[in-house]
Amino acid sequence: MHRLMLRGIQCYGCRSHVIQSFLAIADITFPAPRYHKPCPRSPLHHQSSFSSLHGQPFRGQSIARSASSGEPSVDNGSEQSPDAASQSNEHVPWYLKEETAELASHPLGQQQLIPPLPDNPPPMLEDLLQHISVDIGLDDLSLLDLRNRNPPPALGANLIMIIGTARSVKHLNVAADRLCRWLRSTYKLQPTADGLLGRNELKIKLRRKARRAKLSSNVSSSFEEKDDGITTGWICVNVGSVENGKPAAGAQKRDFAGFGNVADSARIVVQMLTEEKRAELDLEGLWNGNFPPRSPSELRAFEQQFEQFAEKAAAEATSGRGMYRDSRSHATGSGIDPGQRRGLHTSRRVQSISIEAVLSPGMVPRQEAALNHEDHLVSPRNAPAKASKPLNVPPEITSLLQHLAQLPRDDALRELGSGPRDMGSTLFLRLFQQALDNAEDPDGNILAKLELIRIAVTLQHPQYTKADLFDAFKELAASGYDISESQALQTVKTLLSFGDNDADVSNVAKRVLRSDIDLALKVLNHMSLRGMDILSREVFSMLYTASGFQVPVRPTNDNLSPSSVETEKSTPVSAEELNEVRLVQDRLRKIMDAFDVKFGPEQFLSLLRFHFHHGNYDQFWAIWRKMSLLQLPRSKEFYVLLFRLHAERGNQKRAAECLSSWVPMMAREQPPVHLDADIARVVMACLLVANPDVKQRADAGDPGEYPNLWNRCWNALVASQTVQE
């Protein structure tokens, strides 16, 4: 009978209901079927007898209970009660529950996300973003809505900027070319692409560049990669004026001064950059951080605030209450027509008050900074007009500071007491305070305190901080006296120095704190207002050193032996930290090239040591070869540094290459570098790294290259000792 019944049911869903009913009577659970409605082509009477069992897993006891109670059967389309649903779910074992498959997120999924549309977007913006992401293949898309900027950007009003990352320089040019062609064919626009090379032009330049590199490698000469227009890494596609979105219902048109009508169209610009160029420029940070959008109400409030501030400053200047008055400035009274004062567009001069003083107090400090000792330096324009000559430290204080500098470090730290406010706990501090009290010029005490704190910070006294040094410099700047360049450079050098407090206990590779670098940049900014040339080689050399690590480092993913000398003498750091340091180096180097800053021998020594300690060997050798092109002689000090760095690094392969290449080059330098005792010591140390058995080979009379060089160095040491005796 059951076989005939199953044969008569042709629908798969109905047959599953029949099987499910028998399993439920046998006290066996079964998951709910996927088909909730029987097939209409099977009109057999067996279907209605099992309709009450449809759509839910159940047990035999529940069916017997429902049959005995005589309750009507529930239709297939009816909903279950919460109690029945919870009771049925309790009896489903874990191995019969349907698992929802969770798709793992792709690692590249975050790079291919399309940014959300802004309010009132142009109609073509969504298609443009879809085409840039899917068809062209730009990653990490970012959309900046600059339509509410006042004043508008230089690219045009109602600007929408799209920023994307290309995979390579070739992909960058291909993507920009395809985008321009798509805009011309689809929307009949005339886009312009700055930095885009034609298809044939790009192929020709790449082919010529490869040919030059091959010829340079054949003649064993260095290939200088100049800016040939290929590796710019940045293409700006200006889509042009497009139809703008519908404005908001309550938006009001802004008044403007000029001719013509207000443009209702929008302008779209697509910035395509390589990953390195995008990290270097940081367009998102420039537009979002430094220039936040301002609404019309914010602009009106800002203009009112500026008017109140300017009127208050003018009243103080007229009444003579201003502490530091500029003799060149003149107080403007009520003769100015109020209609001519419009905040941002004003041309009146009120006690050297500038617009930056209201927008950013840290950029141009206010006059009250000298009185309140705030965190901002006093502008030279607002400083008191005192003597044009710089301050001089009295001779008694100078002798005390010289005596302090000659003491051993532990004794000097003990004599400095417990901090800048301690003036009597030690004999040195009592003598120093007595000399300050007896000084003929009290203003000279400011410079004396600055020198004392600078020496204490240099000695790494725990109670003297770099913030105390910056406060002393602010006091000197507020005094109104001239500050010499040597005093400013010494202060900056101390602020950028490494110290025990510059790193955590867990971080062995010490770096200068970001806050200390900001203090040094504030000092340089103030000195630039005084007319000092801050784009000098001394300043760039200090910034180079402060941007990196204090000790030799290596990437954590280097496959070096744990017992190797290079592993023992270098500190592992993450690749992200190394990339950050190299990015800062590249920016500093580009600024130097733009302003034609030339390094001297002292700066080149520091720069070579810096790049070698950070594992940037390509840049190290580029600077080493560049010195000959600049007609700077590589003297004895440079070769001592070269061999010493390779000996301290402990890399056998690099030490061998250095010896074979640059020991013969010493005799070809102009003037020649002779193998004396100083160079012989570092060359022998480098030989022990390249070949640890070189001494035994030399004693055994081995005629090899390394044993002969060892004997030459040994003879140079013996000759030097003979001359000294």
UniProtKB/Swiss-Prot annotation:
The keyword Mitochondrion applies. It comes from the Eukaryota. Residues 45-54, 63-89 have a biased composition (Polar residues). Probable mitochondrial mRNA stabilization factor. InterPro entries: Atp25, NT_sf. Keywords: Membrane, Mitochondrion, Mitochondrion inner membrane, Transit peptide. PANTHER family: ATPASE SYNTHESIS PROTEIN 25, MITOCHONDRIAL. It is a peripheral membrane protein. GO terms for cellular component: mitochondrial inner membrane. Residues 1-66 form a transit peptide. One of its GO terms (biological process) is mitochondrial gene expression. Residues 39-89, 317-346 are annotated as: Disordered. It is found in: Mitochondrion inner membrane. This is ATPase synthesis protein 25, mitochondrial. The keyword Transit peptide applies. Belongs to the ATP25 family.
